[in-house]
Curated annotation (Swiss-Prot):
Protein name in the entry: MLO-like protein 8
Signal sequence segment: none
Pfam families: Mlo
Stretches of the chain found on the membrane's Cytoplasmic side: 68-92, 203-304, 348-393, 452-593
Highest rank taxon of the organism: Eukaryota
InterPro entries noted in UniProt: Mlo
Membrane topology: Multi-pass membrane protein
Region: Calmodulin-binding, residue numbers: 465-486
Length: 593
């Protein structure tokens, strides 16, 4: 029916090798098979050995240089999160390399393992073949290009079985080991490609929000969001977009959230309202904060989690191989699981925005200016926003594995194998897997990066890289000097990586963060200018200061009625560390407020 057979793919690969080796490879048929002599390395021309080694060395070095170049570009552009993700990819490739080496050097010992023949006929992925029919077919068929012997990576020659005892067979054959070796190779290639596509689609989606962010600096935006104007809650754009009579009915509530993720996952009103809510809760109202760049940094932090392969995911990979039994329909289950997870996560994220809109209508009948959304971890499953990211991680891994598995079967067994009784259905499953990739990368993952900002905690990516490192270094210096004591006052009380009250000043750039008393679940910061501190720029990188910078830390806390004393300030001009300040009420602190 016009479908390319998997043998054609193998022939194209062999043709490329034939061209590279100068045409020294010939086609072996069943009639000439007995005349073929399998020569060892000491009987192989040195030019052939050198040519093959040169080919693999050049390809390996080029790949290594490519990864090194990508890492250098990310380092120069201060893309720390993406650089960490690249290191994770390298680590996963190294794990796959170790698996390949173990398969190569352990093949001799694995082939010595014998098991009873009746055990070898259990849990087969394909129906057991008719031995008599198989012998007849083998006598009439010709060998494929270069015969099947060309596929042995480490065995060189299909050695006869060593299980001489009657009723015993090999645990796994040399050809099966080689096919498993090819699967590892496919996993490495598709893991890199899949990770690249996931990140690129996510960044492409968030880049589309840039013109909304630029709009917040215009005079039209200031006029449209006039804080002195009163409006009915149900007349605001955000509430009208997410609420109606049907949203009060649970069934229609989730049906509407399900379909909204496909057509208008994030609109202009959603972005501006969530941006306003984030700044009002975590920063000083009216701050010139580049929310779009912050979301992009947050997405890069999430990508570090998504790109890795944890032991749990390796366990799911082994479980799939174990349960892929004839008649169990494991391949259909493996295709359906990622679809269900991604659709459920997308529906949940849309439901969170709708619940925030309903919360506005329940709290207020009239709002002043733009409606203020109040996020909370209780909106998420089990109160854990990070659980959604782990679910997407599992779904993306399973989806990538299904695509890899399809191409591996196509290459190793062809399009008419027992794995794919109907090749058209297999193509439909691959199309669904690609659709899940686009849906998760372009819609769900950016939506997650946006909605999770409405949680109870602020992510550390709100700080640029330089400020975050400086605050961490200051914190470690304080712990080293004073030790860990119950009465020690630390920046960020819970020991998190993002301090909650600080003022960082430098000779090269001045960045001040002042703490104000707000609602029990929120912190507000003032004076954080990401346009000057954000390192995530598209076309320029920061240059280090010519002279060693000096930092000055001032912590200002609103005075209690019982506090007395004077404010002291310690400055160290010859050190990059920060000095801890013990605040006390004074006239100066009153004026700062």
């Amino acid at each position: 029916m016009g479908i390319i057979d998997g043998s054609l793919l193998r022939r194209l690969i062999c043709l490329c090798l034939w061209c590279l080796l100068g045409g020294g490879v010939t086609v072996v048929t069943a009639e000439d098979e007995k005349k073929v002599v399998h020569k060892q390395l000491n009987q192989t021309p040195t030019w052939a050995v050198a040519a093959v080694c040169t080919f693999f060395i050049v390809v390996s070095v080029l790949l290594e240089k490519l990864l090194h170049k990508v890492g250098k570009v990310l380092w120069d552009r201060h893309k720390t999160a993406l650089l960490d993700a690249l290191e994770k990819i390298k680590a996963e490739l190294m794990v796959l390399g170790f698996i390949s080496l173990l398969l190569t050097f352990g093949q001799t010992y694995i082939l010595d393992i014998c098991i009873p023949s009746h055990v070898a006929r259990t849990m087969l992925p394909c129906p057991a073949p008719n031995l008599k029919k198989e012998d007849d077919d083998n006598g009439e068929s010709h060998r494929r290009l270069l015969s099947f012997e060309h596929r042995f990576l480490s065995g060189g020659e299909a050695s006869p079985t060593k299980c001489t005892k009657e009723g015993y067979v090999e645990l796994i054959s040399a050809e099966a080991l080689h096919q498993l070796h090819i699967l590892i190779f496919f996993l490495a290639i598709f893991h890199v490609l899949y990770s690249f596509l996931t990140m690129m689609l996510g960044r492409l989606k968030i880049r589309g929000w840039k013109h909304w962010e630029n709009e917040t600096s215009s005079h039209n935006y200031e006029f449209s969001t006039d804080t002195s104007r009163f409006r009915l809650t149900h007349e605001t754009s955000f509430v009208r977009a997410h609420t109606s009579f049907w949203t009060r009915i649970p069934f229609f509530f989730y049906v509407g959230c399900f379909f909204r993720q496909f057509f208008r996952s994030v609109g202009r009103t959603d972005y501006l309202t969530l941006r306003n809510g984030f700044i009002a809760v975590h920063l000083a109202p009216g701050s010139q904060f580049n929310f779009q760049k912050y979301i992009k940094r947050s997405l890069e932090d999430d990508f570090k989690v998504v790109v890795g392969v944890s032991p749990v995911l390796w366990g799911s990979f082994v479980l799939f191989l174990l349960l892929n039994i004839d008649g169990f329909k494991m391949m259909f289950i493996g295709t359906a699981i990622p679809v269900i997870i991604i659709l459920a996560v997308g529906t949940k994220l849309q439901a969170i925005m709708t619940r925030m809109a309903l919360g506005i209508t329940d709290r207020h009948a009239v709002v002043q200016g733009m409606p203020l959304v109040q996020g909370n971890d209780e909106y998420f499953w089990f109160g854990r926003p990070h659980l959604i990211l782990h679910l997407m991680h599992f779904a993306l891994f399973q989806n990538a594995f299904q695509i890899t598995y399809f191409f591996w079967i196509w290459y190793s067994f062809g399009s008419d194998s027992c794995y794919h009784p109907n090749f058209k259905i297999a193509l439909v499953k691959v199309a669904i897997a690609l659709g899940v990739l686009c849906l998760c990368s372009y819609i769900t993952l950016p939506l997650y990066a946006l909605v999770t900002q409405m949680g109870s905690r602020m992510k550390k990516s709100v700080f640029d890289e330089q400020t975050s490192k400086a605050l961490k270094k200051w914190r470690m210096a304080v712990k080293k000097k004073k030790g860990v004591k119950a009465t020690t006052k630390r920046l960020g009380g819970d020991g998190s990586a993002s301090p909650t009250a600080s003022t960082v000043r430098s000779t090269s750039s001045v960045r001040s963060l002042q703490r104000y008393k707000t609602t029990p679940h929120s912190m507000r910061y003032e004076g954080l200018d990401p346009e000057t501190s954000d390192l995530d720029t598209d076309n320029e990188a920061l240059t280090p200061p010519k002279s060693p910078p000096s930092f000055e830390l001032v912590v200002k806390v609103e005075p209690n009625k019982t506090n007395t004393g004077e404010t002291s300030r310690d400055t160290e001009t010859d050190s990059k560390e920060f000095s801890f300040v013990k605040p006390a009420p004074s006239n100066e602190s009153s004026q700062d407020r």
